Amino acid sequence: MLTRSPASAAATSPTTTVTVTVTAAATSPRPSRGAAPHGHFHYAPTPSLREAASRIPALSSRRQSATAPATSSTSLPISIQSRHGPAPVASHTSSPVASDPGLGFPPSSRPQRWAGVDVVAQYSPMEPMDYTTGALLSSQAASSSNNQAVARGSIESRPSHIPNTVGPMASHEEQASALASTSEATAAPIPHGPTVAVAVPPTPGVYSAAPQPHPLSHTPQTGTPVKRRNSQGDVTHNQVEAASAGQSGPHSPKRARLAPKIVSRRYEHCPVEDLVVLIAHMLGELIELNDEAAQKVGQRHNLTRFHSRTTPGISVLDYLHRLAKHAYLSPPILLSMVYYIDRLCALYSDFTINTLTVHRFLITAATVAAKGLSDSFLTNTLYARVGGVRVAELNMLELEFLHRVDWKIVPDPDVLVAYYGGLVARCPGYILECPEPEEADDEDEDEELDESDAIGDDDDDIDGEGGEREEETSSSQRDRHAT
């Protein structure tokens, strides 16, 4: 509620034009502040809009500074609330600094300020008031305080220019414009005198164009600056030399091949593991050749008892290692299995070694060779368990194999020697040991013959001397008888 005497309204300047927007309170009467102590109340009528309009220009004239022009047009929206109304309402007031044309603010771009109104205090936001104590000031005190404020200089509650800040997702053009506006706003004339370094905080929301080092990539520097500089130069020079040498130098040589393993010329002395590798290498080449030939021709394989429905998951090398380890296969048995391949293919035209027949052939050939060449062998139950087939199926495979090879399962020893030499020659990682020199054997034989001849001559000499002695003894005996 505005409580001003009519006398103050008469002091209004006739040259000032003020536009006032007043929100009147409820028209219902309300008790005055000076109520009687015994419950007698008198009601003060609400001031009319005409009286309020006559009071506002007087108040606004007192608030204007000495530097303001004589005539101005000011819009003062004021919200008048009742004493027992809701929470304080923010009213829109004009700042004397913002309305000062000397600061360069156009009328349309004046910054907006808000002033809170305490409902309990019942004062007008346009009345002069000491905000430190909360007491109202008289007209003389208000004018003196205004003069002191003008003498000290106006204090702005916000900066004269707010730079346009951009968010983290702004484009490069917006960031560049924000940096330019910030530099223009913070530019100031350089004073004549000693230079003072001032730290200017960065504008929030604007990214700096200079690259910032990563905190994790920063390494502590030790030593004097000169040593640090020299060490950095040395490291950079070394890095450049290493890079140029790597680009211009020859390519690094490939890994050297391992030397071939030397095996004995007699297959009986060859280790089982090496013989398994030799046989697996030969079977791999044979399977690859037969599979490619079948795909080119496009003919369908004639099914045999050795065919599987699908390719087993174990490789030929691993399968051979399993058989040799758990079925106790010796080198002659392994070489006999290779011999059976040629014999079965020669006598059974529908059979070929491929990915579907190799596993069943190997377990069948191992069973037959162990029974035909070894003095001790396992039962078909154990062979079937090692080979991964049923006992009944292994029995059928064994009978089929014996019938196809015409029951001839014992190869000639010279044939096994020939197969062994062929396996070593086909595998690149193995070679046979050098043969023993024959000249040494011939010399030994000649020496033995010479020794035997010398022994024979000695025997002849002994025999001749004995004969002469016998003749002498016989002649002497004759002479005695004659006498």
From Swiss-Prot:
Annotated region (Disordered), positions in chain: 1-112, 164-234, 434-483
SUPFAM superfamilies membership: Cyclin-like (SSF47954)
Keyword Repressor listed: yes
Biological function: Negative regulator, together with pgov, of the transcriptional activator nuc-1, which controls the expression of phosphorous acquisition enzymes.
GO molecular function: cyclin-dependent protein serine/threonine kinase regulator activity; protein kinase binding
Keyword Transcription regulation: yes
Entry keywords, A to Z: Cyclin, Repressor, Transcription, Transcription regulation
UniProt family annotation: Belongs to the cyclin family.
Outcome following mutation: E398Q: In ML178; loss of function
Record gene name: preg
Organism: Neurospora crassa (strain ATCC 24698 / 74-OR23-1A / CBS 708.71 / DSM 1257 / FGSC 987)
Top-level taxon of the source organism: Eukaryota
Chain intervals with Low complexity compositional bias: 1-32, 60-80, 176-200
Record's compositionally biased regions (Acidic residues): 435-473
PANTHER family documented for this protein: PHO85 CYCLIN PHO80, PTHR15615
GO CC terms: cyclin-dependent protein kinase holoenzyme complex; nucleus
Name of the protein described by the UniProt record: Nuc-1 negative regulatory protein preg
